[in-house]
Amino acid sequence: MNWDYPQPFTLPAMPQAEDIDGLNHTNNAVYVQWCEKIGWAHSESLGLSLGDYQRLDRAMAIRRGEYDYLLPTALGETLTLATWLTASDGKLTMERRFQLIRNRDQATVLRGRWDLVCIGLSTGQARRMPPEFCQAYLSVLARPADRP
């Protein structure tokens, strides 16, 4: 697959009947839910779960979400969703990117981006990333893949 960044963390996706909207394609809100699902799965694969967030009283919260819906997808299509961590100041902020590819023709149907900020769960206020976040997340920051 022609990924925007190397070494993606991926999950399969397939629109179900309840995901299809009145325009007869996957509702845009479903893509947002899939992005949340893969974001958590990626974090857990790096050793940080919701339980760890609660124990550390820290979380990476979405400050801004941006989605480019490039092509529609239909009921039962096989898709692959990828995510990467692509930037961080190592203190408060991080960027996560997403790309959704339709398997049958390798077309990119969605690109997304989250700007994240570290917060204290107990206060909701911005707080410095704990060492556990830096160790897990900063070691996997991706750089854009070469494109023709």
Labelled PLM ranges:
Residues 42-94, 109:
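Hydrophobic beta-strand-centered segment that forms part of the acyl-chain substrate-binding groove
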Residues 23-24, 83, 124:
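Hydrophobic pocket/interface hotspot
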Residues 37, 41, 45, 68, ...:
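Solvent-exposed, charged/polar functional surfaces in cytosolic regulatory/catalytic domains
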